[in-house]
Amino acid sequence: LLQLSDIEVSFLSRNSISRHGLTTNLDKSKKLSSSNCKIKLNKKLFEEKYFLYAEFVLFHEYIHSLGNFSHDKNFRQLENLWPEKKQMNIIGRQLTRELQEIKAQWAWTCSKCGFVVKRSSRKFRSNYFHKECLGKLKNIPIIRPTSLEH
């Protein structure tokens, strides 16, 4: 475990929405190991409300750095050693939703019930529908106030 203290930890790019952590090789020509890896974390994890979840994400990335690359049965057994892992999954989904909300530039709005799904991409087909009420979805740009409008 002493090897883990030598692993470089930095931030993910600002545009990361669904990724909360990433373990990469320092030297791509060599196999990933605790001596040849770097861990990147989403900056949002350093907000006080996400501190406990940040510890879990770091634990998850440390499992990768110890040679468990895929999310297979062995990886999940190690990850399940974390106390209250189910709660961490809930917090992770909340963080993803918050990041989506911040980055959203488009909203898919249901014409029948008014349900809204915010999206960062404009990709849209006219035949999309809301699975709950079967209303047709419309793609609407989100207009954010500029700094001059404040």
State each model region's role.
Residues 1-48, 52, 69-150:
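Metalloprotease/metallohydrolase-associated module, dominated by Zn2+-dependent proteases
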Residues 56-68:
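Active-site recognition of the HExxH zinc-binding catalytic motif
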